[in-house]
Design a protein with these regions (language model features):
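Glycine-rich, aromatic-bearing surface loops/beta-hairpins
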Residues: 85, 93-94, 98-155
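Short gly/pro/ser/thr-enriched loop/turn and capping motifs at secondary-structure boundaries
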Residues: 37-39, 64-65, 108-111
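General beta-strand structural signal in soluble alpha/beta enzymes
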Residues: 5, 31, 57-60, 80, ...
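Long, hydrophobic N-terminal alpha-helical segment
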Residues: 2-55
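Short, hinge-like loop/turn segments at secondary-structure boundaries
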Residues: 47-49, 75, 118-119
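Ordered, amphipathic secondary-structure segments that act as subunit-interaction surfaces
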Residues: 59-104
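Short coil/turn connectors at secondary-structure junctions
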Residues: 1-2, 24-27, 54, 73-77, ...
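Generic hydrophobic/aromatic pocket-lining and core-packing "Φ" positions
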Residues: 17-18, 88, 129
Length: 155
């Protein structure tokens, strides 16, 4: 069962590993990222950041969608993390039903539009969010930590 979906360019870090894991009683984190899934060093760092009480999957989009749709994680409390909205849009297009996405930290550079203190989006991010919004089935919200109030996210 999917208990949380978050966009966070840092993937698994203290806030996600501790606060969200405890609040949502996560038993498995799934990092969905084509590049990270092929990088042994990044996967090792993610393993070290994952709480001992949780399992970790680091998968490319296609494999993540295949496993979720096959019910592989139905008996677990799954928390999905991705760096970019495009990744989650691809997951949705592959047939994974997501009902809400927590828009967390997205890196800010000179080429991006800043949305608040912790979110920076480029044209690709904006297009992905607009397509997700147009589906009408996914609630987008911002909530940095479980103790913060959730706010609707609109592009």
């Amino acid at each position: 069962m999917i208990v949380g979906v978050r966009i966070d360019f840092r993937l698994i870090h203290g806030q996600v590993a501790n606060l969200w894991a405890n609040t949502e009683q996560v038993t498995r984190f799934m990092v969905v990222d084509d590049e990270v899934s092929q990088d042994a060093t990044q996967k090792q760092v993610l393993r070290m950041a994952t709480p001992a009480s949780c399992k970790l999957s680091v998968l490319p989009v296609e494999k993540a969608a295949e496993n979720i749709k096959a019910g592989k994680y139905d008996a677990q409390r799954l928390f999905i993390v991705a760096k970019k909205p495009e990744t989650l849009l691809r997951l949705i297009r592959a047939g994974v039903e997501l009902t809400e996405i927590n828009v967390g930290n997205m890196t800010a550079t000179d080429e991006v539009k800043r949305i608040g203190r912790n979110i920076g989006m480029d044209a690709g991010d904006i297009a992905a969010f607009q397509e997700i919004e147009s589906l009408g089935t996914v609630h987008l919200f911002m909530q940095m930590a479980p103790s913060n109030p959730a706010e609707d996210f609109e592009v």
